[in-house]
């Protein structure tokens, strides 16, 4: 998850490749009461990263988000990033498997009576182990139990994991809007590796 906003290329004399993206907005208006997701592995731990260091946050954001074209927070300096993630309304939780960071989620509780799931994802090495639904359930539980809210929402991108939308809907989120956007390909600008490609992300070369 992570909305890749449009940015112009550094060299304005060159033709900038634009990527077309569909941003899908989903919401949950009450806490789910259905069947719980079973714990997929043993030796799991979910810990809140209180006053998370910038270096550790960058590791999580870059490692989890690179395959899915997360790049906005790569563009900002350490002091600006620290100011963002150290706001009292931001909560960051990290999933560990046998002591190794396997994924994270970030909640924004700034708005009254609603919470935004800003970022959510797994380290690539841990994809395919049924950890995604388990971590999402933990994020939902935290959002609904930490304070009184009437809405939990998020948005996902065309370039997110191909199962992302389905997983969100299975967890109880409902689509309420879509928006078409275009943005300069961050691989051309050196923000992400040029070799990065997956469906529907076309190769550069």
Identify the role of each PLM range.
Residues 91, 150, 174:
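Short acidic/polar active-site loop segments enriched in Thr and Asp
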Residues 127, 154-164, 181-191:
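Conserved beta-strand-loop-alpha-helix junction that forms the acyl-donor binding cleft
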Residues 18-21, 182-205:
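Acidic/histidine-enriched, glycine/proline-rich intrinsically disordered or flexible terminal extensions
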Residues 122, 128-143, 165-170:
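Conserved acetyl-CoA-binding loop-helix of GNAT-fold acetyltransferases
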Residues 143-156:
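Conserved GNAT acetyl-CoA-binding A-motif
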Residues 1-50:
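Acyl-donor-binding surface of acyltransferase catalytic domains
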Residues 75-79, 85-124:
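A conserved beta-strand-loop-helix scaffold within acyl/acetyltransferase catalytic domains
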């Amino acid at each position: 998850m992570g909305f890749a906003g449009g940015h112009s290329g550094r060299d304005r004399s060159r033709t900038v490749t634009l990527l077309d993206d569909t941003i899908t907005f989903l919401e949950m208006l009450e806490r789910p009461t259905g069947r719980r997701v079973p714990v997929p592995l043993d030796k799991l731990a979910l810990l809140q990263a209180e006053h998370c260091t910038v270096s550790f946050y960058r590791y999580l954001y870059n490692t989890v988000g690179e395959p899915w074209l997360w790049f906005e927070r790569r563009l900002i300096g350490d002091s600006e990033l620290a100011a963002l993630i150290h706001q009292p309304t931001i909560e960051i939780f990290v999933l560990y498997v046998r002591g190794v960071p396997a994924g994270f989620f970030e909640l924004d509780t700034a708005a009254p009576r609603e919470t935004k799931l800003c970022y959510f994802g797994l380290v690539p090495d841990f994809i395919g182990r049924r950890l995604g639904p388990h971590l999402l359930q933990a994020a939902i539980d935290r959002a609904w139990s930490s304070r009184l809210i009437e809405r939990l929402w998020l948005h996902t991108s065309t370039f997110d994991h191909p199962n992302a939308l389905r997983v969100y809907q299975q967890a109880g989120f409902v689509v309420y809007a879509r928006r078409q956007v275009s943005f300069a390909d961050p691989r051309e600008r050196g923000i992400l590796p040029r070799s990065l490609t997956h469906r529907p992300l076309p190769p550069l070369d």
